[in-house]
């Protein structure tokens, strides 16, 4: 018999397998929308965010590269705003440091312009075209002929975000559970 049956003898409305950022964010958002639902999050490791979530680059993406009008584009732009607001509200360290996308050769300009147009169409905040001088002002060790400045992107530790989701689920929704080593 699986271990979780001996730990929990309850019925749940929703069971989510995986205690990474996707599983925990899903459980948290579902509980916010449906506070009476009993949700069980099962994580096989000793702690949440032990795999991909805890080992990625931590980039807060802007929505720059996605096809305009796509769900990915909308969800990325909206999700970035929501993530940054969540991080501020819960005092999770993050840095909205921006990024520079650089064309180092004339042959790259057409693609860079396509990326810029995607960013505008997707509602990426503050995106602007920049020249070689501005590239150097932002990032002195970067060389390019033209570029894009995307000030709304940044970095965050998604393991910290996941741990906060697990903490909030346990504190706010006592009918729901996050169980590790299951």
Predicted regions and their residues:
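Glycine-rich FAD pyrophosphate-binding loop
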Residues: 31-55
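Conserved Rossmann-like nucleotide-cofactor binding loop
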Residues: 22, 26, 47
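Proline-centered flexible-loop/turn and helix-kink motifs
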Residues: 35-36, 88, 140, 174
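Helical element adjacent to the flavin cofactor pocket in flavoenzyme catalytic cores
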Residues: 148-182
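Gly/Ala-rich phosphate-binding loop of Rossmann-like dinucleotide-binding domains
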Residues: 27, 31, 168-170
